[in-house]
């Protein structure tokens, strides 16, 4: 028995209409279905779901580094940053990063879910860490 891939992502949201607009405008998500408290999208083949949950605390989530990262090309980095600014998306301060670790933009949706647009790959990260993070142990499978 093996895990095949990510099936879908679901985010709890407080305002369905505001969140639909966010995901359409920021991610280019294509709305597939909308109900009273749920919406499903296709994001370039990824199933994204939103469910309304109004009475849950949302004020401390920004202190966690937990996030979902999406790949963007290096050529599109500045354009994507400008788009987020134009859409008045909350852009977060990123961590200090070596250029070999590529570029990232961290931002949140209207409910504080944290995302990253990243120009690197897992292999870029591993290559960089192998050269610079000598305390790390690497495994071959």
From Swiss-Prot:
Enzyme Commission (EC) number: 2.5.1.-
Highest taxon, organism lineage: Bacteria
Enzyme class: transferase
Name of the gene: fosB
Family according to the record: Belongs to the fosfomycin resistance protein family. FosB subfamily.
Name of the featured protein: Metallothiol transferase FosB
This protein's UniProt keywords: Antibiotic resistance, Cytoplasm, Magnesium, Metal-binding, Transferase
PROSITE patterns, sorted: VOC
GO cellular component: cytoplasm
Enzyme active site: 116 (proton donor/acceptor)
Record-listed Mg(2+) binding positions: 8, 67, 116
Gene3D superfamilies from the UniProt entry: 2,3-Dihydroxybiphenyl 1,2-Dioxygenase, domain 1
GO molecular function, a single term: transferase activity, transferring alkyl or aryl (other than methyl) groups
Cofactor(s) needed for function: Mg(2+)
Purpose: Metallothiol transferase which confers resistance to fosfomycin by catalyzing the addition of a thiol cofactor to fosfomycin. L-cysteine is probably the physiological thiol donor.
Record's subcellular location: Cytoplasm
GO annotation, biological process: response to antibiotic
Record's signal peptide: none
Oligomer status and interactors: Homodimer.
Species of provenance: Lysinibacillus sphaericus (strain C3-41)
Domain VOC intervals: 5-120
InterPro entries per UniProt: Fosfomycin_Res_Enzymes, Glyas_Bleomycin-R_OHBP_Dase, Glyas_Fos-R_dOase_dom, Metallothiol_Trafse_FosB, VOC
């Amino acid at each position: 028995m093996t895990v095949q891939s990510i099936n879908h992502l679901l985010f709890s949201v407080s305002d369905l209409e505001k969140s639909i607009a966010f995901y359409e405008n920021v991610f280019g998500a294509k709305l597939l279905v909308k109900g009273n408290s749920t919406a499903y999208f296709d994001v370039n083949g990824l199933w994204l779901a939103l469910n309304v949950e109004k009475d849950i605390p949302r004020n401390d989530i920004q202190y966690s580094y937990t996030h979902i990262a999406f790949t963007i090309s290096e050529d599109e980095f500045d354009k994507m940053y400008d788009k987020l600014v134009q859409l008045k998306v909350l852009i977060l301060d990123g961590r200090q990063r070596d250029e070999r670790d590529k570029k990232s933009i961290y931002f949140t949706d209207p409910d504080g879910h944290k995302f990253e647009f990243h120009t690197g790959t897992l292999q870029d990260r591993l290559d960089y860490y192998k050269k610079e993070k000598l305390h790390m142990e690497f495994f071959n499978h």
